[in-house]
């Protein structure tokens, strides 16, 4: 069985054996089989996987840190705990880190924060995979902002940005995990957004940066799992150089990739990519 999230210690590195022991191998196999069936029969869009992701996320974060030891990915189960976690990374001299943050108080929503320490200044940017018009993202953003302001971290600059790439109801956790990895892999491309955050150019600190203002800052690889074709086209209209960019080992462009993962749901073209990503992530936890 999967242990309660509050009982799983995700700080520090665990071995592959310890990671796998957080969840029954047999149960995990059954979950993966059901996820694959949901994609095959087309029921994936109308199912809610959020509670399952909340339970599995600690193991996924450990696995991510095992794969990328310098990513410094942290799972924060409530905004109330965020400031002390940030204080710890600053005091430990960590220059760059990521935080997957959960709503807490029984909530299911996730976002991801990218942290960078530049010339004695702290830059924190919350990346929301959906948009702030929905209750979950809005509440998590407010709680996060309040927690950071209450602690009064020295020379700390905080902004919230919306990616608006999520259309289904329960994929915020997998989106946040995928974005956390991209924030690490593409870290050299993100220097400008952090510099603009510190300068106060990125946002006024009160209102989130809308997706059309965010798009020029991010490489096309951040949009691999974009669920809506219209949203993907919006990004490519702003970043035409991304149209021909190869985004994976299959030599696919972002448009090729969308077409190869698209499904028609309620008359709309939607990508099933992030649901396949969940399966791939869950499979990394299986014992050989």
UniProtKB/Swiss-Prot annotation:
Record-level Gene Ontology MF annotations: acyltransferase activity
Enzyme class, first EC level, given as a word: transferase
Modulation of this protein's activity: 1D-myo-inositol hexakisphosphate activates protein-acetyltransferase activity via an allosteric mechanism: 1D-myo-inositol hexakisphosphate-binding induces a conformational rearrangement that stimulates the interaction with acetyl-CoA.
The protein's Enzyme Commission number: 2.3.1.-
Disulfide bonds: none
Keywords (A to Z) from UniProt: Acyltransferase, Plasmid, Secreted, Transferase, Virulence
Binding residues annotated for CoA, in chain numbering: 109, 167-168, 227-230, 266-270
Keyword Transferase: yes
Entries under NCBIfam families matching the protein: PRK15371.1 (NF011898), YopJ_YopP_only (NF040632)
Free-text function comment from the UniProt entry: Serine/threonine-protein acetyltransferase translocated into infected cells, which inhibits the host immune response and induces cell death by mediating acetylation of target proteins. Inhibits the MAPK and NF-kappa-B signaling pathways by acetylating protein-kinases such as MAP2K1, MAP2K6, MAP3K7/TAK1 and I-kappa-B kinase (CHUK/IKKA and IKBKB) on serine and threonine residues critical for their activation by phosphorylation, thereby preventing protein-kinase activation.
Protein's name according to its UniProt entry: Serine/threonine-protein acetyltransferase YopJ
Organism: Yersinia pestis
């Amino acid at each position: 069985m999967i242990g309660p999230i509050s009982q799983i210690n995700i700080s520090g590195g665990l071995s592959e054996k310890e990671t796998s022991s957080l969840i029954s191998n047999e149960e995990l196999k059954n979950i993966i089989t059901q996820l694959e069936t949901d994609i095959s029969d087309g029921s994936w869009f109308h199912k809610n996987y959020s509670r399952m992701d909340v339970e599995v996320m600690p193991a996924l974060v450990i696995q991510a840190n095992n794969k990328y030891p310098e990513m410094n990915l942290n799972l924060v189960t409530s905004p109330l705990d965020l400031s002390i976690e940030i204080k710890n990374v600053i005091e430990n001299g960590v220059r760059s880190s990521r935080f997957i943050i959960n709503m807490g108080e029984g909530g299911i929503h996730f976002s991801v924060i990218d942290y960078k320490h530049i010339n004695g200044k702290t830059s924190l940017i919350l990346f929301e995979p959906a948009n702030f018009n929905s209750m979950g993202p809005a509440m998590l953003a407010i709680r996060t902002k309040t927690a950071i302001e209450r602690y009064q971290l020295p020379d700390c600059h905080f902004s919230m940005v919306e990616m608006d790439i999520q259309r289904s109801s329960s994929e915020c956790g997998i989106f946040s995990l995928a974005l956390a990895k991209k924030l690490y892999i593409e870290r050299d491309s993100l220097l400008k957004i952090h510099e603009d955050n510190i300068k106060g150019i990125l946002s006024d600190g009160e209102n989130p940066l809308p997706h059309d203002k965010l798009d020029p800052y991010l490489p096309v690889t951040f949009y691999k799992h974009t669920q809506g074709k219209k949203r993907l086209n919006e990004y490519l209209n702003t970043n035409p150089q991304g149209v021909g960019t190869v985004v994976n080992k299959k030599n696919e462009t972002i448009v090729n990739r969308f077409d190869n993962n698209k499904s028609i749901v309620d008359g709309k073209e939607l990508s099933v990519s992030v649901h396949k990503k969940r399966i791939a992530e869950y499979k990394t936890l299986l014992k050989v």
